Curated annotation (Swiss-Prot):
It comes from Brevibacillus brevis (strain 47 / JCM 6285 / NBRC 100599). Its EC number is 2.7.1.148. The gene is ispE. Pathway: Isoprenoid biosynthesis; isopentenyl diphosphate biosynthesis via DXP pathway; isopentenyl diphosphate from 1-deoxy-D-xylulose 5-phosphate: step 3/6. This is 4-diphosphocytidyl-2-C-methyl-D-erythritol kinase. GO terms for molecular function: 4-(cytidine 5'-diphospho)-2-C-methyl-D-erythritol kinase activity; ATP binding. It is an enzyme of class 2 (transferase). It catalyses: 4-CDP-2-C-methyl-D-erythritol + ATP = 4-CDP-2-C-methyl-D-erythritol 2-phosphate + ADP + H(+).
Length: 292
């Protein structure tokens, strides 16, 4: 038996860090939404009980360092499943990009194995398991648009934002999320986003207010470490983007654009500067369907 599950990328419309927690994590407040750039995770039942993984990108780890592998190992142990699984990840989301590709692969694996192994778990139960793998995994289990709080595992679902084009551009570097958080001085943050205003913008589908409300406290840290990120931001703004922000810990930057004519201009300007440029749409509602 074989199942395929889409694993969409996410972008942060806001990312705020409120405090460093005693457990070493940070208390965050983030508005996130999934976009239609997606990996695909194929899962094939193994009767020998083994868990194996292959990926279309050769540099992606195929062991416990991989979030999807970790998800399968956790599910098998937690529910004492006799069978195993072979995972194949068709990688379309750039790695170490601030787009939660690894977390989304893990979430897709949880959803797929729930069906493949006939576990009968709810999305809420899967999200709780996902929190043991990584802070972005619970959001990725649900998809759509949501406010994430706590260390990212507490999810409040939101309606769809105003429809628009999203242009993603990733410079040819990887960014370590622990390194970015390690360089963040919470007491010195002076660019906290207005999360309430963003929630209002989404509730009213106000595109202009959504662009005004974009904010990410990790952006200045990554910009100081990687000047290429600022160059991409500046190029997007100069080319007429309505709103521009770095996603997650970076280095991917996204532009929000309402008029299609602008999309081509911004895309062409970026393609002369970086290789990884994607034009996508927000998925809006909860996503992550099982394909087959």
């Amino acid at each position: 038996m074989r199942i395929s599950v889409k694993a969409p990328a996410k972008i942060n419309l806001t990312l705020d860090v409120l405090a460093k927690r005693p457990d070493g994590y940070h208390e965050v407040e983030m508005v996130m939404t999934t976009v239609d750039l997606a990996d695909r995770v194929d899962m094939t039942l193994r009767e020998d009980g083994e868990i194996t993984l292959d990926c279309s990108a050769s540099f992606v780890p195929d062991d416990i360092r991989n979030h999807a592998y970790k998800a399968a190992t956790l599910m098998k142990a937690k529910f004492q499943v006799r069978q195993g699984v072979h995972l194949y990840i068709d990688k379309q989301i750039p790695v170490a990009a601030g787009l939660a590709g690894g977390s989304s692969d893990a979430a897709a694996t949880l959803r797929g194995l729930n069906q493949l192994w006939n576990l009968g778990l709810t999305r809420d139960e899967l999200a709780k398991i996902g929190a043991e793998i990584g802070s972005d995994v619970p959001f990725c289990v649900y998809g759509g648009t949501a406010l994430a709080t706590g260390r990212g595992e507490q999810i409040a679902h939101l309606g769809a934002p105003a429809p628009c084009w999203v242009i993603l551009a990733k410079p040819p570097i990887g960014v370590s999320t622990p390194d970015v958080y390690g360089n963040l001085r919470v007491a010195q943050i002076d660019n906290h986003p207005d999360t309430k205003q963003m929630l209002q913008a989404i509730a009213t589908q106000d595109f202009s207010l959504m662009c005004q409300s974009l904010g990410n406290v990790l952006e200045n840290v990554t910009l100081s470490l990687h000047p290429q990120v600022r160059q991409i931001k500046d190029l997007m703004i100069a080319s007429g983007a309505d709103g521009v922000l770095m996603s997650g810990s970076g280095p991917t930057v996204f532009a929000l654009v309402q008029k299609e004519a602008k999309v081509h201009r911004i895309y062409n300007a970026l393609r002369g500067f970086v290789k990884d440029v994607f034009v996508v749409r927000m998925l809006g509602a909860q996503e992550g369907e099982i394909l087959a």
